[in-house]
């Protein structure tokens, strides 16, 4: 809610998944809330929040998408985007603990803005891409850099460990964020920015 209050809408929807987003779920939920919001139980702050969407069919990520991060990694900004996948089993809630994998020596974290695609999409024009976006969600892109970079091969082995994709605490719909390029993102580690 705009005032920060969290409400339980499970009387309307059991999960935010591809079926929900693909069938105008956000619009239907808003219509339902207009009539039923006062009946929804309040979710207390002590309640654990899971990820704000169910496991999607895929998580596509863009690597080295910030010049500063590329420089920190000792890499050039690529001419062509570096794409990689994260396993959907990496998804956890926004405040869940991250499990450091056995043998990890260089676990790292990056705050990212994830785009939630709300419609099935293939070969979409740049001009029409915005019509497929359901919203935006914060994503902590956790990585084990030794697995990812020093052991060669695919990045997935350093990016897809269980708990390496905390999401949330909520999805902001595209009408709530007029220009995602102007957002100021930050991350806290052990209480420090």
Regions found by a protein language model. Name each.
Residues 50, 56-193:
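Glycine-enriched loop-and-adjacent helix/strand subsegments that border the catalytic/binding cleft
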């Amino acid at each position: 809610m705009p005032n920060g209050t969290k409400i339980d809408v499970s009387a309307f929807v059991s999960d935010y998944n591809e079926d929900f987003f693909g069938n105008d779920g956000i619009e239907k939920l808003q219509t339902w809330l207009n009539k039923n919001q006062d009946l929804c139980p309040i979710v207390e702050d002590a309640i654990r929040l899971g990820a704000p969407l169910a496991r999607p069919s895929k998580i596509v990520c863009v690597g080295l998408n910030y010049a500063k991060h590329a420089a920190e990694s000792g890499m050039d900004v690529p001419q062509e985007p570096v794409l990689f996948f994260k396993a959907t089993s990496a998804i956890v809630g926004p405040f869940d603990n991250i499990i450091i994998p056995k043998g990890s020596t260089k676990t790292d974290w990056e705050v990212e803005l994830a785009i939630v695609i709300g419609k099935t999409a293939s070969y979409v024009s740049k001009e029409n891409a915005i019509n497929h976006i359901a919203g935006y969600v914060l994503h902590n892109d956790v990585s084990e850099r030794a697995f990812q970079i020093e052991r060669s091969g695919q990045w997935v082995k350093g990016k897809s460990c269980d708990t390496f994709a905390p999401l949330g605490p909520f999805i902001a719909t595209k009408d709530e964020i007029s220009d995602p390029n102007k957002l100021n993102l930050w991350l806290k580690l052990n209480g420090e920015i």
